[in-house]
């Protein structure tokens, strides 16, 4: 047990001290509202109406230096609309964003030290691959075809705020910094109860996205570090429940008989007690556990997770919320990056004939296949006003004020991302229907802008090469560029291709 404690404390030994003075540095606020770090592909940039100017920041820092008591109670936050004599919401938001930058410093230094041994090009290549929303499918294809059971786990939240602060204190020892953290949490949440996900977390994440994502990612990182430690130790610990008893009974009296008769049975018996490798994958607020053997071990790990959440994080979770399914009988659904996905293992039979009059050999192979969820995609298109609930294309009035190139570019980007994301599916009939809806919706939007008819616009479309190129299928463009290899390209395009260039969220979510 002492060895395990040392292992758990090893990564926390390099604790960072005295981060609180960074709050008073003007350069930190320049990083917060600078062009480089403010832009994010996941969080929409917040318009502060130039309220975070350097002059206001300098006045805020001066005010903080002159303030004697930095700890503000929850009643003061609720009663007063002025924060240290100024607008509470504005300055609290500015300081919380700077706080997120400051607490990210020690974790960024650890990440940088872990990447020092790699080449720059290799780091960029691997980073772009991991950023891809599509990277989950090659993982499924490589690992899940050999597995039998999968469990989709919802990572429970919210966590009690005091527990979160105590966990953060393991990594950073700076009391003033945690007093400031409690002040922010007092402002947005009720300290004496659990967070209400529908109210407090929603308002907190919208007003302070960087701060919220740091706290949530830190909680997930702490949970995963303990879980992966337990998984690693369970696969390497010496298991003595049955083997020691077996050896004590038969070793002295029948050692020759044991070695000669039971070597294979003895090894197979030990393998039943040894935990196999559990595959773990996390995406957004969920995680996936997959195993090859019987569901008994999956049930064991399910109760491990529940005990970890309840005892260590004080988060209540019911065993019935974690389901264990057999991959051969169930399809696996998940929602990631704004895309609906449905993964299934199909059994394909390969028949081979040795000689003309000889016997046939049938080999059953597992093949990972993705199904295009046509109904959820049509609901998303209807919500974004590209079609009605029945899937009939309609115009997009909000985009009618844009230029022709801007309208076509937006429709093309949405269609290309959806096409690339679901191109790994073997059945593309539903995908062609989605392309048709977007293409006709784009035409109707342009017709609405120019106050014309669909027939007149299609005639114009045939005379303009620029518009014609935008409405040409990608496989048609490839066949025009490489006419001799058109048949090969058609087979390639009809196959299963995983694109690793999808790093942005679904445009249906962003532009709805």
From Swiss-Prot:
Highest taxon listed in the record's lineage: Eukaryota
Keyword DNA-binding on entry: no
Molecular function per GO: RNA binding
Keyword Chloroplast: yes
Subcellular location: Plastid, Chloroplast
One GO CC annotation: chloroplast
One GO term (biological process): tRNA processing
InterPro entries: Domain_X, Maturase_MatK, Maturase_MatK_N
UniProt keyword terms in alphabetical order: Chloroplast, mRNA processing, Plastid, RNA-binding, tRNA processing
Stated family: Belongs to the intron maturase 2 family. MatK subfamily.
Its job: Usually encoded in the trnK tRNA gene intron. Probably assists in splicing its own and other chloroplast group II introns.
The protein, known as: Maturase K
Annotated organism of origin: Dalea wrightii
Gene transcribed to yield this protein: matK
């Amino acid at each position: 047990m002492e060895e395990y404690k040392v292992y758990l404390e090893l990564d926390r030994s390099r604790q960072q001290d005295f981060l609180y003075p960074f709050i008073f540095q003007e350069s930190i606020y320049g990083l917060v509202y600078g062009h480089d770090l403010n832009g994010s592909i996941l969080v929409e940039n917040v318009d502060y109406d130039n309220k975070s100017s350097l002059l206001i920041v300098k006045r805020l820092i001066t005010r903080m230096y002159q303030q004697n008591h930095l700890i503000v109670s929850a009643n003061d936050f609720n009663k007063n609309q002025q924060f240290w004599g100024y607008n509470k919401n504005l300055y609290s938001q500015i300081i919380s964003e700077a706080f997120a930058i400051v607490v990210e410093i020690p974790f960024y230094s650890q990440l940088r030290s872990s990447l020092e041994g790699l080449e720059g090009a290799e780091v960029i290549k691997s980073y772009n691959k991991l950023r891809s929303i599509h990277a989950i499918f090659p993982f499924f294809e490589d690992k899940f075809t050999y597995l039998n059971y999968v469990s989709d786990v919802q990572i429970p939240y919210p966590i009690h705020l005091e527990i979160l602060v105590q966990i953060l204190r393991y990594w950073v020892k700076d009391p003033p910094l945690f007093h400031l953290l409690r002040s922010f949490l007092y402002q947005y949440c009720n300290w004496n109860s659990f967070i209400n996900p529908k109210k407090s977390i929603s308002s907190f994440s919208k007003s302070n996205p960087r701060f919220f994502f740091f706290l949530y990612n830190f909680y997930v990182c702490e949970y995963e570090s303990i879980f992966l430690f337990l998984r690693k130790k369970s696969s390497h610990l010496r298991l003595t429940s049955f083997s020691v008893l077996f050896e004590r009974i038969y070793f002295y009296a029948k050692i020759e008989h044991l070695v000669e008769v039971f070597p294979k049975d003895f090894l197979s018996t030990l393998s039943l007690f040894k935990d196999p490798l559990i595959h773990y994958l996390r995406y957004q607020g969920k995680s996936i556990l997959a195993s090859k053997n019987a569901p008994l071990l999956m049930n064991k790990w399910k109760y491990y997770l529940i005990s970890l959440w309840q005892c260590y994080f004080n988060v209540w979770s019911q065993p019935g919320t974690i389901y264990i399914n057999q991959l051969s009988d169930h399809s696996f659904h998940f929602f990631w990056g704004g895309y609906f996905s449905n993964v299934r293992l199909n059994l394909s039979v390969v028949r081979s004939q040795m000689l003309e009059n000889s016997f046939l050999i049938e080999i059953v192979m597992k093949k990972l296949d993705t199904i295009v969820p046509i109904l959820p995609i049509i609901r998303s298109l209807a919500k974004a006003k590209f079609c009605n609930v029945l899937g009939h294309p309609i115009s997009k009035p909000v985009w009618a004020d844009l230029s022709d190139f801007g309208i076509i570019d937006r429709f093309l980007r949405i269609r290309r991302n959806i096409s690339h994301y679901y191109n790994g599916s073997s059945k593309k009939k539903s995908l062609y229907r989605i392309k048709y809806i977007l293409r006709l919706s784009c035409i109707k939007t342009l017709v609405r802008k120019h106050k014309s008819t669909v027939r007149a616009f299609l005639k114009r479309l045939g005379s303009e090469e620029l518009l014609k190129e935008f409405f040409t299928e990608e496989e048609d463009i490839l066949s025009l560029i490489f006419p001799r290899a058109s048949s090969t390209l058609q087979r390639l395009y009809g196959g299963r291709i995983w694109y690793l260039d999808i790093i942005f969220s679904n445009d249906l979510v962003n532009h709805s």
